[in-house]
A protein has these predicted regions:
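Short coil turns that delineate tetratricopeptide repeat
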Residues: 65, 97-99
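Residue-level signature for tetratricopeptide repeat
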Residues: 42-43, 47, 60, 77-78
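TPR-adjacent "capping" and linker segments in tetratricopeptide-repeat scaffold/adaptor proteins
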Residues: 2-11, 21-34, 93
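Canonical positions in the second alpha-helix
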Residues: 60, 94-95
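Hydrophobic/aromatic side-chain positions at a characteristic register within alpha-helices
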Residues: 32, 45, 79-80, 96
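Structural signature of tandem alpha-helical TPR/SEL1-like repeats
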Residues: 48-54, 80-92
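Structural register within alpha-helical repeat arrays
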Residues: 39-40, 74
Length: 99
């Protein structure tokens, strides 16, 4: 199992993160694979940069509104950053409805 520090310290991730950060002003013109944007959100979460984690999660939800992975991350953010159990339940219900 790769630890988070190693996962975020490789050339490919650094390139993806640099692309994301460089495009902050115009994200609509950029495309990211769901795994890449999820890694970006996880990276900011790992670094305790909640504001940027929220932005990355919102961007992921914009690109992939029905992705279970994105909905899980939204639920985690709602629960652990917002302390909003009702919002977390809402995302969990959306995931459940897909299955």
């Amino acid at each position: 199992m790769v630890n988070k520090e190693d996962r975020f310290n490789n050339k490919r991730f650094k390139e993806v993160l640099a692309k994301y950060e460089a495009g902050q002003g115009n994200l609509d013109s950029l495309f990211f694979d769901v795994d890449d944007i999820m890694d970006i959100a996880e990276y900011y979460n790992y670094k305790a940069d909640v504001d940027n984690a929220r932005k990355a999660v919102a961007f992921a939800a914009h690109l992939y509104p029905t992705s279970p992975m994105v909905l899980i991350l939204q639920a985690r953010m709602a629960l652990f950053s917002d302390f909003d159990i009702d919002k977390a339940r809402h995302y969990a219900q959306l995931i459940e409805q897909q299955g």
